[in-house]
């Protein structure tokens, strides 16, 4: 008995010591090669996704003499979450995403978040339009297509919520043209697959916004990266993994990279480093050792969709129809039936279904989550898990789903669907931010966030949705934070040529909304609606023809969707 007790005690002590060693093991102290460049490059971009490439595109136009180097671990650009198959492709404008417009306790609808996101997407349209005009992006139909956005609900409470949401939004110029209906015949005209086979006694409602879009962020990222390489001041390094980050006494950074083809390491000195590595950004932030990194952790969640490629189905669904999450469900559970343009053909995707994984990237390691845990964030992560038990239960339930379970969910939005119509596809990984709040301690943070060191020499983008849709706006914020002096000394003037609405709120003025949307609609071959001087409830607004190019009730209180 005593021997058993001693043995058990020994195991407990050994486990405790191993845990302490694991949590306190240094993240960033190891021997690395010295930098092989005495004169530092101006910017190092880590990660070949849309964020790094968008920032590089801005910088190349604002400061063409700067030397920029981009390092990507995989053998191509936009292979992770920026790839068309790895995200929902929604041009997030808050037209359809109900979780951006929560119902408050007094019954009113909060629309500030929706307006902000809608304005951010208009900035994206301006940025992409500028790139098209300068030949840095291909014909617009290769990366953005008019795809109406719908919200679709059933049940009296949710119908009333959607009615109030519609009434609140259409008073704003950016949402002019959104239609609302409870008439099954009208909704069937908008989206036949949603209504066919549905019982006649089920009360439904929908909103329909003709200005919605479907976006292929992979095409945008790859084409912008291609044109970045036209400059002799830009260098792209594929199959190169960043393994260490060290700040020098002069505030420059030594970025150590491993060539995955031969295993050799080298270091590059840089004045500024941007970590835009998607899910891997957290671990790289921790490698930097900056004090700000101690306030963050991450929780990975994968996504899966049901994919339809049969033209008999895809030709009859040309909208993105967003539903409402079940009560108590987390944001990644918001269901949507999406029309997509991928690999040159029409696709319909339904989902997402959460996929539990400890990977931070689709092509990552199963040890990603564990290697990000340390003595700064371990207790906080456990606390977040305890305080978000609904999320834990949801993920456990999703892990046990069968194909029959997924099909049952599908039938709520596509009543006539057959199991033989679809295949299950795995999308990209997302890493939800766990952040230290001064008052609440560690909390689950939704959205994206820029983390920057006090010297403004290293910046990291953490988080997820709306993400790629608002990448030009997010990178504008980063430019202002990281390069305040350059902004004052001429960049702001140049930015107004790239983003004509820069420094203004588009939603504040029908005239500005019309000016910007008319310009971007013409350049991007998208439909256009003229907003009256005094925006009011529209009555069958007329859509201008597309320009032809020559070539509570809120069942999801967290403000985010996958």
From Swiss-Prot:
GO molecular function annotation: 2-hydroxyglutarate dehydrogenase activity; L-malate dehydrogenase (quinone) activity
Enzyme Commission identifier(s): 1.1.5.4
Associated pathway: Carbohydrate metabolism; tricarboxylic acid cycle; oxaloacetate from (S)-malate (quinone route): step 1/1
Keywords: FAD, Flavoprotein, Oxidoreductase, Tricarboxylic acid cycle
Domain of life where this protein originates: Bacteria
GO biological process: tricarboxylic acid cycle
Residue stretches spanning the membrane: none
Family according to the record: Belongs to the MQO family.
NCBIfam families in alphabetical order: mal_quin_oxido (TIGR01320), PRK05257.1-1 (NF003603), PRK05257.1-4 (NF003605), PRK05257.2-1 (NF003606), PRK05257.3-2 (NF003611), PRK13339.1 (NF009875)
Name by which UniProt lists this protein: Probable malate:quinone oxidoreductase
Organism: Xylella fastidiosa (strain M12)
Lineage: Bacteria, Pseudomonadati, Pseudomonadota, Gammaproteobacteria, Lysobacterales
């Amino acid at each position: 008995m005593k021997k058993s007790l001693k043995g058990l005690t020994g195991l407990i002590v050994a486990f405790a010591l191993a845990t302490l060693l694991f949590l306190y093991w240094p993240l960033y102290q190891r021997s690395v090669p010295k930098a092989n460049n005495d004169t530092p490059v101006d910017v190092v971009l880590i990660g070949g996704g849309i964020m790094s490439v968008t920032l590089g595109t801005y910088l190349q136009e604002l400061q063409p003499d700067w030397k920029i180097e981009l390092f990507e671990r995989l053998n191509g650009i936009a292979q992770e979450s920026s790839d068309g198959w790895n995200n929902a492709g929604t041009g997030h404008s808050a037209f359809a995403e109900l979780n951006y417009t929560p119902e408050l306790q007094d019954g009113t609808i909060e629309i500030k978040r929706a307006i902000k996101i809608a304005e951010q997407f208009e900035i994206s349209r301006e940025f992409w339009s500028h790139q098209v005009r300068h030949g840095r992006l291909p014909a617009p139909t290769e990366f953005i297509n008019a795809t109406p956005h719908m919200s679709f609900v059933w049940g009296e409470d949710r119908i009333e919520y959607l009615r109030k949401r519609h009434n609140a939004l259409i008073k704003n110029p950016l949402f002019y043209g959104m239609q609302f209906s409870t008439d099954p015949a009208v909704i069937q005209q908008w989206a036949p697959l949603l209504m066919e086979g549905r019982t006649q006694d089920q009360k439904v409602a929908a909103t329909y916004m003709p200005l919605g879009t479907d976006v292929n962020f992979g095409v945008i990222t790859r084409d912008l990266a291609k044109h970045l390489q036209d400059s002799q001041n830009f260098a792209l390094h594929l199959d190169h993994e960043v393994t260490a980050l060290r700040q020098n006494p002069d505030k420059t950074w030594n970025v150590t990279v491993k060539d995955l083809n031969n295993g050799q390491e080298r270091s590059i000195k840089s004045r500024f480093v941007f970590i835009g590595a998607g899910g891997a950004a957290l671990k790289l932030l921790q490698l930097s050792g900056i004090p700000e990194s101690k306030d963050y952790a991450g929780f990975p969640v994968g996504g899966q969709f049901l994919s339809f490629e049969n033209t008999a189905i895809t030709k009859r669904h040309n909208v993105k129809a967003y539903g409402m999450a079940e009560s108590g469900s987390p944001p990644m559970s918001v269901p949507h039936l999406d029309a997509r343009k991928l690999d040159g053909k029409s696709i319909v995707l339904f989902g997402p279904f959460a996929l539990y994984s400890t990977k931070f990237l689709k092509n990552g390691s199963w040890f990603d989550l564990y290697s990000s845990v340390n003595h700064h964030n371990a207790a906080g992560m456990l606390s977040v898990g305890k305080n978000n038990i609904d999320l834990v239960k949801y993920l456990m339930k999703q892990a046990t789903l069968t194909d029959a379970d997924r099909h049952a969910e599908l039938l709520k939005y596509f009543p006539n669907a057959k199991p033989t119509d679809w295949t299950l596809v795995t999308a990209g990984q997302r890493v939800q931010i766990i952040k230290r709040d001064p008052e609440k301690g560690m909390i689950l943070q939704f959205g994206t966030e820029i983390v920057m060191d006090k010297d403004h020499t290293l910046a990291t983008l953490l988080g997820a949705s709306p993400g790629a849709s608002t990448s030009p706006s997010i990178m504008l914020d980063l430019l202002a934070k990281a390069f305040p002096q350059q902004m004052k000394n001429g960049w702001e003037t140049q930015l107004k040529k790239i983003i004509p609405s820069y420094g203004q709120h588009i939603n504040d003025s029908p005239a500005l909304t019309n000016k910007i949307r008319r310009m971007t609609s013409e350049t991007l071959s998208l439909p256009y609606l003229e907003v009256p001087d005094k925006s009011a409830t529209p009555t069958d607004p007329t859509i201008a023809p597309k320009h032809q190019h020559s070539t509570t009730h809120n069942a999801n209180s967290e403000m985010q969707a996958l």
